[in-house]
Amino acid sequence: MERWRFSLMVFNNKLKHEYGIKKSLDSVSSIENTIENKDSNSKPNIKGRAQNIRSCGGRDNYSYNNIIYLFGVEYNRNLIPNDTFLFRDNKGDSFYISFNIENHIFEIDINFSCLSELEIERYFYSYHGFDYFNFNNGSAIEDYLYNHYMYDTPSNNHITSCIESYLQSQICVNPSIISDSSDSYIFGCFDKRRTHNESRRSGIRNRAQSSYLTIRESFNNLDSTKKYKHLWVQCENCYGLNYKKFLKSKINLCEQCGYHFKMSSSERIEVLVDPDTWYPMDEDMSSLDPIEFHSEEEPYKDRIYSYQKRTGLTEAVQTGLGQLNGIPIAIGVMDFQFMGGSMGSVVGEKITRLIEYATNKILPLIIVCASGGARMQEGSLSLMQMAKISSALFDYQSNKKLLYVSILTSPTTGGVTASFGMLGDIIIAEPNSYIAFAGKRVIEQTLHKIVPEGSQAAEYLFQKGLFDLIIPRNLLKSVLGELFKLHAFFPLN
């Protein structure tokens, strides 16, 4: 559980007499202050350090005369962060910043009438657990309020990077709320204590007059999460945001850390097979519910139809012929989006036919595995596919001495791991792939033992000798081409 608190401190013109602030109209202004240690019962002491404040974009109506703006992010570990904050400029225009760390979401919704008039004055900095706008010389403000409870967490890094990249190019935060009190300051504290069915408000308090000026924090019927979720994909590893339209061109790799997102079978075929060389096989073959399996939730035939409609596929594997860097190949690609890539009678039949065709035509064979195992809706018929495929591979490998490359992606489990997944002459795994026979939950519930974290990851299994290679997705095609040439398979031209 975590909580994020956002603080906005504004020191007004009345401080100039007490703290020697020099007044300057529509130009560079200076404020000499240093924020020292404070407790919950007293306000900050101000003295010391000079900060120059310049007008935003050279516009008079955005002047920062004698005001320093500190935008801080303070980390706490108590409550769930899930709120939306309203920021308003001195023209009354507003924008919202939404954070949902539990669901890995950061969003900004702008309601400005003219976005071009807004710009950031300097940069957004991160220093000792606090992030500041520094309008002086672009260096981080050294604040003696070092927060020893602030940690360099993925969630913190994610939010900091999101705010930094966006606000630097778009937004000028310019609150225009200044009290007339001689020694007052405005302190906005947005506490995150909202449940799923509640929306709460937080106030900006004038401590000298004990009056409250309310800023709306949470909004009823505000669902910005759903509004923009279709545009972005968040990395599970670094929490970075990836724009969906660019993700395909980057072969579903995270721009920040290179994490491998899941891919559909069609996307993998597009990556591995040369353009205009793909020729599908047995694409009209589909299951007929051989054991008439019916569940309380949904009949098997209806479930098959729903996945066919959703994915555009007839089954959980695509098989066919193509060329890889000009080398003719036979390739089968499983699709986890179709019933978890489960292996039923049709999947087994399509893969067996592909192997037999490659045997007759003396073609190298590639099978990309992504499966949860045998399909329970087809009972023992699905288990029979393990033996059928293994038998066809025996003839292909042992009798014809041809090359079979097995590529294991995340996840590869169950009957696929126990059969053709581990029978390759060369076994290649993608980085961070989840590969196992029985899943972690099944093992723990059956044996009542805790499965160590990472014990079913590709890197750990590689150290134990289960694979030959771990190849990143962007290098896979070139590596396969070199392997085929090494085994005397050459391009047609």
Curated annotation (Swiss-Prot):
User: Where does the record place the CoA carboxyltransferase N-terminal domain?
Assistant: 231-493
Q: Which cofactor does it need?
A: Zn(2+)
Reply yes or no: does the keyword Lipid metabolism apply. yes
Q: What is its EC number?
A: 2.1.3.15
Q: Name one GO cellular component term.
A: acetyl-CoA carboxylase complex
Which pathway, per its entry? Lipid metabolism; malonyl-CoA biosynthesis; malonyl-CoA from acetyl-CoA: step 1/1
Write down a Pfam family by its short name.
Carboxyl_trans
Please tell me whether the keyword Transmembrane is annotated for this protein: no
Recorded catalytic activity of this chain's protein = N(6)-carboxybiotinyl-L-lysyl-[protein] + acetyl-CoA = N(6)-biotinyl-L-lysyl-[protein] + malonyl-CoA
C4-type zinc finger span:
235-257
| Compartment(s) of residence | Plastid stroma
Note on cofactor: Binds 1 zinc ion per subunit.
List, alphabetically, the SUPFAM superfamilies matched.
ClpP/crotonase (SSF52096)
List the GO biological process terms.
fatty acid biosynthetic process; malonyl-CoA biosynthetic process
What are the GO MF terms of this UniProt record?
A: acetyl-CoA carboxylase activity; ATP binding; carboxyl- or carbamoyltransferase activity; zinc ion binding
PANTHER family, per the entry? ACETYL-COENZYME A CARBOXYLASE CARBOXYL TRANSFERASE SUBUNIT BETA, CHLOROPLASTIC
Query: Into which family does the record put it?
Result: Belongs to the AccD/PCCB family.
Q: What does this protein do?
A: Component of the acetyl coenzyme A carboxylase (ACC) complex. Biotin carboxylase (BC) catalyzes the carboxylation of biotin on its carrier protein (BCCP) and then the CO(2) group is transferred by the transcarboxylase to acetyl-CoA to form malonyl-CoA.
**What is said about its interaction partners and assembly?**
Acetyl-CoA carboxylase is a heterohexamer composed of biotin carboxyl carrier protein, biotin carboxylase and 2 subunits each of ACCase subunit alpha and ACCase plastid-coded subunit beta (accD).
Database matches in NCBIfam families: accD (TIGR00515)
Annotated protein name in UniProt: Acetyl-coenzyme A carboxylase carboxyl transferase subunit beta
Naturally occurring in which organism (per UniProt): Epifagus virginiana
Annotated gene? accD
